[in-house]
């Protein structure tokens, strides 16, 4: 039997990775919504059979903020790539692989459509919130010339004020400044 090109037998097992943060990791996430420059993703790391029917999480990529998660308990399983019937185990043939499943199971199709509409509404409102914040940040950055450099990181700000601001960040930089003062007779 021909399998999918990117089939993984461990698809229903959560992605075990080094903890890069408190967020869930989605190995093959898919884009479900693009709104005002913010892209919303959902992934296919399914933790359990229960989560097939009641998935957990959606992500949005926000410029400058990285990944942002919304934990939505009632996401559509089709969006997560689970492609399984409402209460079927992993080994069975998925409902969405059956030809004409919408006609055969109209109640399930209506329920899933309603869930998908609600999910997209949540994601759209989330994206709208983030684009509003981003446009406000961008307007503030354009109006304030010192803040505009922050878009390029602190290395672009080679001014004395930025050096002083960086110096008070951590102990090692304070120690280096003390050494410079002592040995080079130098005060930044």
Curated annotation (Swiss-Prot):
The keyword Transit peptide does not apply. It comes from Orf virus (strain Goat/Texas/SA00/2000). Plays a role in the inhibition of the host NF-kappa-B pathway early during infection. Prevents the host RELA subunit from reaching the nucleus and activate transcription. Keywords: Host cytoplasm, Host nucleus, Host-virus interaction, Inhibition of host NF-kappa-B by virus, Virion. GO terms for cellular component: host cell nucleus; host cell perinuclear region of cytoplasm; virion component. This is Protein ORFV073. Interacts with host IKBKG; this interaction inhibits host NF-kappa-B pathway activation. Transmembrane segments: none annotated. It is found in: Host nucleus; Host cytoplasm, Host perinuclear region; Virion. One of its GO terms (biological process) is symbiont-mediated suppression of host NF-kappaB cascade.
């Amino acid at each position: 039997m021909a399998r999918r090109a990117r089939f993984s037998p461990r698809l229903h097992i959560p992605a075990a990775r080094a903890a890069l943060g408190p967020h869930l990791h989605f190995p093959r996430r898919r884009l479900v919504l693009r709104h005002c420059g913010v892209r919303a993703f959902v992934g296919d790391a399914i933790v359990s059979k229960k989560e097939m029917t009641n998935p957990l999480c959606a992500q949005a990529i926000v410029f400058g903020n990285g990944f942002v998660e919304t934990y939505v308990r009632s996401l559509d399983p089709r969006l997560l790539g689970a492609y399984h019937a409402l209460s079927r185990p992993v080994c069975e043939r998925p409902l969405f692989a059956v030809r004409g499943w919408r006609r055969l199971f109209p109640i399930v199709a209506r329920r899933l459509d309603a869930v998908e509409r609600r999910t997209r509404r949540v994601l759209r409102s989330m994206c709208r919130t983030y684009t509003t914040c981003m446009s406000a940040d961008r307007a503030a950055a354009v109006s304030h010339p010192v803040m505009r450099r922050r878009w390029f990181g602190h290395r672009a700000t080679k001014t004395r004020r930025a050096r002083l601001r960086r110096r008070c960040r951590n102990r090692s930089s304070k120690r280096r400044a003390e050494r410079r003062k002592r040995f080079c007779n130098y005060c930044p």
